[in-house]
UniProtKB/Swiss-Prot annotation:
Carbamoyl phosphate binds at R51, T52, R101, H129, Q132, L260, P261. This is Aspartate carbamoyltransferase catalytic subunit. GO terms for molecular function: amino acid binding; aspartate carbamoyltransferase activity. One of its GO terms (biological process) is 'de novo' pyrimidine nucleobase biosynthetic process. Belongs to the aspartate/ornithine carbamoyltransferase superfamily. ATCase family. Its EC number is 2.1.3.2. PANTHER family: ASPARTATE CARBAMOYLTRANSFERASE, ORNITHINE CARBAMOYLTRANSFERASE, MITOCHONDRIAL. InterPro entries: Asp/Orn_carbamoyltranf_P-bd, Asp/Orn_carbamoylTrfase, Asp/Orn_carbamoylTrfase_sf, Asp_carbamoyltransf, Asp_carbamoyltransf_Asp/Orn-bd. Keywords: Pyrimidine biosynthesis, Transferase. Heterooligomer of catalytic and regulatory chains. Gene3D superfamilies: Aspartate/ornithine carbamoyltransferase (3.40.50.1370). Pathway: Pyrimidine metabolism; UMP biosynthesis via de novo pathway; (S)-dihydroorotate from bicarbonate: step 2/3. L-aspartate binds at K80, R162, R221.
Length: 303
């Protein structure tokens, strides 16, 4: 069955995840296909993006779709006072799918409630980034051959990082052994996220206490743009640095992921270790997003 909107990681079932992984495998080495020939994808980026916007653009083109859109709110009629609802309605007239990034929590859900075409959430405020979670899980699946039974450690800004929210919610579709949440007390995962999880979670501030148990260390930068108070940001901006000392305490086959961009939270010396998989992770963005586009827009025998 074709997917409709993808606003949250919870919009995907376990079967959806594995079906997308299988498609991503098939799309990994293709140059150009015509599966979406005649379709138009709108990239509605009300908030700046490099990797996400470019990988979605590339994914659409490689499937044969045409791409329209904008890269900032300033280049749209919203700068003239148009409301978001009207912008979404106008994009419905021009395209078959809208990939949307916005600075406000819940913007993608709002858009999905008024849109007649699929909305794919490319990040909304500090809320969610479900396609990044798809890439994260696909990376883990490619490295280990499975996701169930693994121990995760999420480190850094767990309060404002939307990638963290999406990954935690996506893991409810799997069976992680446990998840360590490693952050300063000011940047702990929000209660409404924790309350929806169905697996063991342990909160700590010290990565050295748990690093030996972790299969997947997921590192996030401190989200400066989400802080209202600059003083609070300055207090926590360099809370953690993943360096060789920490990495050398990991399991030999443990991996380090990061949604990027990286600032100072991973020492560049770590890049050369076998544990560092964040650039490999980034390389999987295009086939995963191709697979998602195909699930949302591709022709189906059962349509």
């Amino acid at each position: 069955m074709r997917l409709r909107h993808v606003v949250s990681s919870l919009d995907l079932t376990r079967d959806d995840y594995f079906r997308i992984f299988e498609l991503a495998d098939k799309f990994s080495n293709v140059k150009k296909l015509n599966y979406l020939s005649g379709k138009v994808v709108s990239l509605a980026f009300f908030e700046p993006s490099t990797r996400t916007a470019q990988s979605f653009h590339t994914a659409a083109i490689k499937l044969g779709a045409d791409v329209i859109g904008f890269a900032s709110e300033e280049s749209t009629s919203i700068a003239k006072g148009e409301n978001l609802a009207d912008t979404i309605r106008m994009l419905n007239n021009y395209s078959n799918c809208i990939v949307m990034r916005h600075k406000f929590d819940g913007a993608a859900l709002f858009a999905s409630e008024i849109s007649d075409i699929p909305i794919i959430n490319a990040g909304d405020g500090k809320h969610e980034h479900p396609t990044q979670a798809l890439i994260d899980l696909y990376t883990i699946y490619k490295v280990f051959g499975e996701i169930d039974g693994r121990t995760f450690g999420l480190l850094g800004d767990l309060k404002y990082a939307r990638t963290v929210n999406s990954l935690l919610r996506a893991l409810t579709r799997f069976k992680p052994k446990k998840v360590f949440l490693i952050s300063p007390s000011q940047l702990k995962v929000r209660r409404e996220i924790l309350d929806g999880l169905n697996y063991p979670v342990i909160e700590t501030e010290n990565p050295y206490d748990v690093i030996q148990d972790i299969d997947v260390l997921y590192v996030t930068r401190i989200q400066k743009e989400r802080f209202v108070d600059e003083v609070e940001y300055e207090k926590v901006k360099e809370s953690y640095v993943v360096d060789l000392k920490l990495v050398n305490m990991m399991k030999k086959d443990g991996i380090i992921l990061h949604p990027l961009p990286r600032v100072t939270e991973i020492d560049r010396k770590v890049d050369k270790t076998t544990n560092a998989k964040y650039f490999y992770q980034a390389s999987l963005a295009v086939p995963v997003r191709m697979a998602l586009f195909y699930e949302v827009l591709g022709e189906r025998k059962d349509d």
